[in-house]
Amino acid sequence: MKRSKAYRAAAEKINPENLYSPLDAVRLAQETSTTKYDATVEVAIRLGVDPRKADQMVRGTVNLPHGTGKSPRVAVFAAGEKAAEATAAGADIVGSDDLVARIQEGFLDFDATVATPDQMAKVGRIARILGPRGLMPNPKTGTVTLDIGKAVADIKGGKINFRVDKQGNLHIVIGKTNFTDAQLIENYTAALDEIVRVKPSAAKGRYLKKVTFATTMGPGIPVDPNRTRNLLEESVPA
């Protein structure tokens, strides 16, 4: 793939053989962003698990203290009073059979979903559409619930879901390049703590194998996966 001049210039500032501290990586990500807008900062983590085995699946939710820098669009499957509760909490799309039908026709203009338990039989009809996109409501992540208002408010406030893919990778947005160093590091710390907390007992060997920071359309920055504490401390030059 042919890279842009801006991308190549940014990549020259990064030593691919070095493992940067998270703080240095955040600063490099901001410095090497190649977009004219505030780019998204994403973290890719390679885990030492075999996702093909049910007892090594890694998934969960985390409340990022500073959000992602984006107000996610939330679709809610609910009816009656619960639909009204969802709307009052700030849900962007609320429906039941009608919302299922729209999604079957190709509508996917939302970032997260929530459903009341009584709606799940209907939502099951579009599981093949929502599931592969990580959009299927799930009681384990608090998105199948009767407390619709809180679920919507949590997502709007920075709660994100994560799930390991078939290759053992996790991708998490920790903010944008206009965030402060501290905001990005605190979001990363919150995500990392939760990922470590849900480590499967069946996972053997090294759990955090590889960590990479990157901005939208920017080069990857290798990060030391062993740096998991006191991340706001200045790094010590080697």
Curated annotation (Swiss-Prot):
GO:BP terms for this protein?
A: regulation of translation; translation
Give the matching InterPro entries: Ribosom_uL1_bac-type, Ribosomal_uL1, Ribosomal_uL1-like, Ribosomal_uL1/biogenesis, Ribosomal_uL1_3-a/b-sand, Ribosomal_uL1_CS
Q: Which Pfam families match?
A: Ribosomal_L1 (PF00687)
**Recorded GO CC terms:** large ribosomal subunit
Check the record and name the CDD domains matching this protein.
Answer: Ribosomal_L1
Q: Name one GO molecular function term.
A: tRNA binding
User: Which of UniProt's keywords are assigned here?
Assistant: Repressor, Ribonucleoprotein, Ribosomal protein, RNA-binding, rRNA-binding, Translation regulation, tRNA-binding
Q: Which domain of life is it from?
A: Bacteria
Could you say which protein family the record assigns here? Belongs to the universal ribosomal protein uL1 family.
- What's this protein's function? Binds directly to 23S rRNA. The L1 stalk is quite mobile in the ribosome, and is involved in E site tRNA release. Protein L1 is also a translational repressor protein, it controls the translation of the L11 operon by binding to its mRNA.
Instruction: Extract the NCBIfam families matched here.
Output: rplA_bact (TIGR01169)
- Quaternary structure note: Part of the 50S ribosomal subunit.
Write down what this protein is called. Answer: Large ribosomal subunit protein uL1
Q: Which organism is it from?
A: Frankia alni (strain DSM 45986 / CECT 9034 / ACN14a)
